[in-house]
């Protein structure tokens, strides 16, 4: 039976692993494909130490992002209500609809913090009144805000 070789991946490879993973592969696969294409590096103690340091930095970065998102969530839920003014027709029906871009602009105007409009979920709004929207600030952090649609 052939001996397996440990390599550290430099890129994500389908069905093998993602960047920074330590994997065992056949020596021929490593020697003939992974190493010449610079898709992997032989696993030496120095390389393993670098990989561990890179993972720790990534963990710290993700933790900092989550803490920043928690702070944004607190700010949004403290303000709680954001007002959007729209032109109104008969029976409090608004012209057009309230878009996620308009909600993002209202949040930015009130908090001076940019929010990605793609993370905002707004119900179908076609009348004036109060509506709830969710803002996804991070994969693990979601804030619920209230949108007031008022006449212009």
From Swiss-Prot:
Tell me where on the tree of life, at the top rank, the source sits: Bacteria
> Does the keyword field hold Cell wall biogenesis/degradation?
no
Q: Does the keyword Ribosomal protein apply?
A: yes
Name the keywords, alphabetized: Ribonucleoprotein, Ribosomal protein, RNA-binding, rRNA-binding
Question: Which PROSITE patterns does the protein's record reference?
Answer: RIBOSOMAL_L9
Q: Name one Pfam family in it.
A: Ribosomal_L9_N
Gene Ontology terms, MF aspect: rRNA binding; structural constituent of ribosome
Enumerate the Gene Ontology biological process terms. Answer: translation
The coiled-coil regions, if any, are: none
Gene3D superfamilies (alphabetical): Ribosomal protein L9, C-terminal domain (3.10.430.100), Ribosomal protein L9, N-terminal domain (3.40.5.10)
GO cellular component assignments: ribonucleoprotein complex; ribosome
NCBIfam families, sorted: L9 (TIGR00158)
What's this protein's function?
A: Binds to the 23S rRNA.
| Family according to the record | Belongs to the bacterial ribosomal protein bL9 family.
Protein's name according to its UniProt entry: Large ribosomal subunit protein bL9
**From which organism does this entry originate?**
Crocosphaera subtropica (strain ATCC 51142 / BH68) (Cyanothece sp. (strain ATCC 51142))
| Gene behind the chain | rplI
């Amino acid at each position: 039976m052939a001996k397996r070789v440990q390599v550290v991946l430099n890129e994500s490879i389908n069905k093998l692993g993602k960047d920074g993973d330590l994997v065992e592969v056949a020596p021929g696969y490593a020697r003939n494909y992974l190493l010449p294409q610079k898709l992997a590096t032989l696993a030496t103690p120095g390389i393993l130490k670098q990989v561990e340091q890179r993972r720790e930095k990534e963990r710290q970065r993700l933790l900092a992002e989550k803490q920043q998102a928690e702070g944004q969530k607190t700010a949004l839920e403290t303000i709680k209500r954001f007002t959007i003014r729209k032109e109104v027709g008969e029976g409090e029906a608004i012209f057009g609809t309230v878009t996620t871009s308009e909600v993002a602009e209202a949040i930015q105007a009130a908090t001076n913090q940019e929010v990605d409009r793609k993370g905002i979920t707004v119900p179908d709004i076609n009348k004036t009144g109060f509506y709830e929207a969710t803002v996804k600030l991070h994969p693990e952090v979601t804030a619920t805000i209230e949108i007031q649609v008022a006449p212009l």
